[in-house]
């Protein structure tokens, strides 16, 4: 029992457990690659079809494969009472589980132009952006600057802080999910700034990728999440 407490209650936040499936170890499940709601080439010219296919079929799938493997190993370690193995597996679970969580959000954050990609946010989210950042243009400038300045690999997020009841911009390193920055943060938009997200098309010019991704940003999805999480706005 103490070992289970070590894994499920002390080492990882409850929101991360829920997002990554750690709360369901006793009935171990496997995760699979989600289908995209659009064709690989549907985001061109902002993001090439080649990048989308590799990003989805190879990179995201690899995170899922390794995540399922790590969860199976964790389940075995818990059953055996192997505390050293449990501790050793935490980094693999965080990295690969985070990769799965982050990419599952990322695909929903994008939409072809013909399906509303790039259309400006309206309603309560639009008003919140103006209130918390001054304007949409200032928010985009801030997120682009944070994404360009992020050393190595990671993500830049527009989030709702449910405790403060305001929008914030956060960055996370590697595949850390947003919940690692705080359990009250809800991701509205996440931009992948790993090189695999842009290098084939934009080479090492990350700012160009950040500038163009807004042309296919799915603000409708972000607005729906915001309205659900902050219904009084």
Curated annotation (Swiss-Prot):
Binding positions (Mn(2+)): 55, 103, 192, 196
Transit peptide per record: 1-27
Tissue specificity of this protein: Present in all tissues examined (leaf, petiole, root, latex, callus) with young leaves showing the highest levels in intact plants.
Any coiled-coil regions, as ranges: none
GO cellular component: mitochondrial matrix
Pfam families per record: Sod_Fe_C, Sod_Fe_N
Cofactor section: Mn(2+)
Note describing how the cofactor binds: Binds 1 Mn(2+) ion per subunit.
Reactions catalysed according to its record: 2 superoxide + 2 H(+) = H2O2 + O2
Main location class: mitochondrion
Molecular function in Gene Ontology: manganese ion binding; superoxide dismutase activity
Protein localization: Mitochondrion matrix
Keywords: Manganese, Metal-binding, Mitochondrion, Oxidoreductase, Transit peptide
EC number(s) recorded for this UniProt protein: 1.15.1.1
Record family assignment: Belongs to the iron/manganese superoxide dismutase family.
Stated role: Destroys superoxide anion radicals which are normally produced within the cells and which are toxic to biological systems.
Subunit structure: Homotetramer.
Protein name: Superoxide dismutase [Mn], mitochondrial
Species the sequence originates in: Hevea brasiliensis (Para rubber tree)
